[in-house]
């Protein structure tokens, strides 16, 4: 509360137009609104660890049809003619980043036009936080062809970037979703956040989950207009979550999705 109050005060003192806090906790979200900040409710797909001991334990919580679909996808993905490496800490070498940089540039160029991270960024995280990085790479004929970068939190695995130079059926799902789930289970993590968007994640065990952000806008009339929009958006997001929850792959009645 004190930190948010101070930040708002600095904005006012320096005549700044706005202040934004993204991906805050529910508690921070409520505190910020008490201080007059605008609250925004959004939605992502997260995988939640319900105390699973193995990936098969997770599969056993799914309906029979969804369980079979995932097994088929994994089988096809792992038959691409190469191998998948799951690397963290000192297992990650400097040369791995040269390959991942190529993947990152390819994805960025296709989706957003200009990748915003620099090559130096990957060298920097290698030196400063390698112990908090999970790099999952697909290798074929001694060449890395695809990969995903994840960051390891105290309770959560954060999936952030994916890219490839060769495309194979279901390899994206295997590297970004299923291997991430396996890592979370094996390392006692409570959640996997696989990034924004993607209703395709639903069938793979990632459930619709509310996310929160806070916004202070200095111009009062603009702030009121934004607030009106955020109220209607929040209602729409919560309706979407309610609808999507009915289509999760879990056995009916086995899980609380709140």
Where do the language-model regions lie?
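A conserved beta-strand-loop-helix scaffold within acyl/acetyltransferase catalytic domains
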Residues: 4-170, 215-216, 231, 247-258
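Intrinsic disorder at enzyme termini
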Residues: 236-249
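Substrate-binding beta-hairpin/strand module that engages nucleic acids
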Residues: 190-217
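Catalytic-site neighborhood detector that most strongly recognizes the C-terminal catalytic loop/helix
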Residues: 216-224, 228, 232-235
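Feature representing long, continuous alpha-helical segments
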Residues: 98, 102, 174-182, 187, ...
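Hydrophobic, well-ordered secondary-structure elements that form the walls
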Residues: 142, 159, 180, 184, ...
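Conserved GNAT acetyl-CoA-binding A-motif
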Residues: 14-22, 184-196
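Conserved acetyl-CoA-binding loop-helix of GNAT-fold acetyltransferases
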Residues: 1-9, 167-184, 193
